[in-house]
Amino acid sequence: MEIVKMHGLGNDFVFIDHFQGAPAELPDYPELARKLCHRQFGVGGDGLIMVLPSDKADARMRILNSDGSEPEMCGNGIRCFARYIYDQGYVSQNPLQVETLAGILTLQLSITGDQVTGVRVDMGEPILKSEQVPVLIQGDPVVGARLDVDGQEFEFTAVSMGNPHCVLFVEDYETLDFERIGPAIEKHPLFPRKTNVEFIIVNSPRELTMKVWERGAGPTLACGTGACASVVAAVLNGRTERKVTVHLPGGDLLIEWGEDNRVYMTGPAAYVFKGVLLEDALS
């Protein structure tokens, strides 16, 4: 089985290409994701991405987290996906459209010569109704709501970018018990489908710093949907302007919540390697 490894700001993915046809005997994809994403016994990655044909868009992206769970969307993953299908010649038009569980997204490639140097994604409108995030608390939107974690109280804003996010504003990371609070909020009963968790420091009205605990993946170097949700939350709380640079451990994303109520994300997509999986890796 051939694979390609890609990353968006260090948020890394193993790609399996079924665009031109899947094998007769399909693998157990959740189990395959757990094996391949393992940092010691597999390839290593935050997720497994399948490249599939679509009758609604130019291609369909299916993604599985490193624990085998299937999220609705992944911002860094879809940038890598767009570059991959363009470079493979599966699409020639620009912009292009990709089908996901969160709907059909439009992506604009920045191309210099014959190289894709960046990808701008129309992430759609943020979902702010509590039952659609979903979060079991009253409020449309849920802004400045209170959350109890092991006796410690936090204020949060709930946003969905096709997948749920709990955004918290903090003063620093030194006093934050990230490894305890992150997973506790991810699995908090207020979030029936679990949630991604973003811890945000506001640097200025045009800059945020973000640390993320991803649902199903844990700490990652970047989260595109999380960066989008964080800017929406920051605007709702009156902390930033609508166009913001978000600093993540893996690098920067430019996020804009447009006056058309759509969120736009711009960032890189890079290759790591391509190779062939041996039978030992699949057994």
From Swiss-Prot:
Where are the catalytic residues? 74 (proton donor), 223 (proton acceptor)
One GO BP annotation is: lysine biosynthetic process via diaminopimelate
Write down the EC number: 5.1.1.7
Q: In which pathway does it act?
A: Amino-acid biosynthesis; L-lysine biosynthesis via DAP pathway; DL-2,6-diaminopimelate from LL-2,6-diaminopimelate: step 1/1
**UniProt-annotated binding residues for substrate:** 11, 65, 75-76, 163, 196, 214-215, 224-225
InterPro entries, alphabetically?
DAP_epimerase_AS, DAP_epimerase_DapF
What top-level branch of life does the organism fall under? Bacteria
The main place the protein resides is cytoplasm
Q: Which GO terms describe its molecular function?
A: diaminopimelate epimerase activity
The GO cellular component terms are: cytosol
Q: Where is this site: Could be important to modulate the pK values of the two catalytic cysteine residues?
A: 165, 214
Keyword Amino-acid biosynthesis listed? The answer is yes
Q: List, alphabetically, the Pfam families matched.
A: DAP_epimerase
Protein family membership: Belongs to the diaminopimelate epimerase family.
Q: What is this protein called?
A: Diaminopimelate epimerase
